[in-house]
């Protein structure tokens, strides 16, 4: 099943990479979203904020490490990361939305139980695994014409703040709402060993490229999250770049841009 992009099917747009620190690109993105909203009113943004975290930790002379594409988050750092995601990154996006006339609401994964977050067992510190939650709050906000902007910070049942990978968070929000998903990043989509765009990807092909080391690190996390969403939602997921603003509306409307991931 392909992306439907209708007035009734929500679209979750995951934002990442250097986009969050590029004011011109953000303005172009929200301009495209304004046009898109005329044909599809139910839109949700999900974001991380790794670029802001890297800058903040560097200024504090704190080294940041990753394991298999996921940020290791010591408990002593979770306050800084929460501030970067929920504070800086979220409010930068809200500011652009307000500037372009959107009625925005900034959220975390904990608000209204929109997702269920548990402590990861992968030895990453204060990092959470994210699953679908209660759609009530998001459904009410979308019905009221609001644009939810969700940062990938969660809280588990014990009240612990947890850093959640934004690709995984976006997948969980899609499952909560039975929504379409587009992941925007710095690259055109999934690339092969020759750095050429792969137009279509499925789980078998992904496993081959992961085993060969072609897909690794952050892209491996992204592809696995997209495959999970494609399987659970029974629809295609798109991975594409934010760097071609003139094609963003076409992408959001389901036209052939970037890489299409199917189960």
Curated annotation (Swiss-Prot):
It holds the Pfam family AA_kinase. Transmembrane segments: none annotated. GO terms for cellular component: cytoplasm. It is found in: Cytoplasm. GO terms for molecular function: acetylglutamate kinase activity; ATP binding. The record marks 14, 222 as: Transition state stabilizer. InterPro entries: AceGlu_kinase-like_sf, AcgluKinase_fam, ArgB, Asp/Glu/Uridylate_kinase. Pathway: Amino-acid biosynthesis; L-arginine biosynthesis; N(2)-acetyl-L-ornithine from L-glutamate: step 2/4. Its EC number is 2.7.2.8. Keywords: Amino-acid biosynthesis, Arginine biosynthesis, ATP-binding, Cytoplasm, Kinase, Nucleotide-binding, Transferase. It catalyses: N-acetyl-L-glutamate + ATP = N-acetyl-L-glutamyl 5-phosphate + ADP. One of its GO terms (biological process) is L-arginine biosynthetic process. Its main location: cytoplasm. The keyword Transport does not apply. Substrate binds at residues 49-50, 71, 163. It is an enzyme of class 2 (transferase). Belongs to the acetylglutamate kinase family. ArgB subfamily. Catalyzes the ATP-dependent phosphorylation of N-acetyl-L-glutamate. This is Acetylglutamate kinase. It comes from Moritella abyssi.
């Amino acid at each position: 099943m392909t992306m439907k992009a209708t007035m009734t099917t929500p679209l979750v747009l995951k934002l990442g990479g250097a986009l969050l620190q590029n004011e011109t690109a953000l303005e172009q993105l929200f301009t495209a979203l304004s046009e898109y909203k005329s044909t599809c009113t139910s839109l949700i943004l999900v974001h991380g904020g790794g670029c802001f975290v890297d800058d903040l930790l560097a200024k504090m002379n704190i080294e940041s490490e990753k394991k298999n594409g996921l940020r290791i988050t010591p408990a002593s750092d979770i306050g800084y990361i929460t501030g970067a995601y929920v504070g800086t990154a979220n409010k930068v996006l809200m500011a652009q939305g307000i500037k372009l006339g959107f009625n925005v609401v900034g959220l975390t994964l904990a608000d209204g139980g929109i997702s269920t977050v548990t402590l990861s067992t992968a030895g990453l510190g204060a990092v959470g695994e994210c699953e679908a939650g209660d759609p009530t709050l998001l459904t009410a906000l979308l019905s009221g014409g609001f644009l939810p902007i969700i940062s990938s910070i969660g809280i588990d049942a014990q009240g612990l703040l947890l850093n959640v990978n934004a690709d995984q968070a976006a997948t969980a929000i899609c499952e909560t709402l039975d929504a379409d998903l587009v992941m925007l990043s710095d690259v055109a989509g999934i690339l092969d060993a020759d750095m050429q765009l792969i137009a279509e990807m499925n789980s078998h092909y992904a496993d081959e490229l992961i085993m060969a080391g072609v897909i690794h690190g952050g892209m491996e996390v992204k592809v696995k999250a997209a495959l999970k969403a494609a399987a659970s939602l029974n629809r295609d997921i798109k991975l594409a770049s934010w760097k071609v603003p003139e094609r963003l509306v076409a992408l959001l409307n389901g036209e052939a841009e970037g890489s299409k991931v199917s189960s």
